[in-house]
Amino acid sequence: LLEMVKAVVTNRLALTVVISDIVRFTGYYVLFSMMVYQCTAVIGDMMAMTYVLSSSSLFAILGNVVAPMVCSKLGGRKKTVALFGLITGLSFASIGIFGQTTWGFTICCSLAFFFMSFIDTLDTMLYMDAGEYWLYKTGKDTRPYLLSMYNVSVKAALALSSVVLGIILVAIHYEPGVTLTGSAASTLTWATGLGPGLGYLLPV
């Protein structure tokens, strides 16, 4: 067990991938919670969430179909993940500008989910790369363990997302049941966009 932990803590590649995924997934889960506040308190229509999720899911499927073909032509996995992490983060951040309407929120999320699919295509391979590096460096095969760290990253992010969500709502002085307008609506919209946006931009 100690050797397995060491394979993550002292393996720079593995540690980078795990931390990056925790940050990314935290932003991802925060978005799903913030969607509820955005649709009810800013857009004023809970049905908007149905449109956003339906469109985003379709674009994510489309992204998963084309991503393998595109990624295979772009070269290095780390650079490709960084590139699409940047594009995904900016797509989420654009919610702050366009997200106060149903159409704007839907388009921004759909684009982000499309580009996110390119990261998902390569993400688990980065864990394998970290395992290959450790095998080359030490002669010890920890690849199965490192691949399992993907699930650990997801669960850690899920736990962190509730904390981050609470911090965001306190920071913007959110009041339940109030339809926001003006600067208050703008603040919540930016929080909705920057939550996942920073989650994808920071690991870049």
Spell out what each predicted region is:
Residues 1-204:
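Membrane-embedded alpha-helical bundles of multi-pass transporters/translocases
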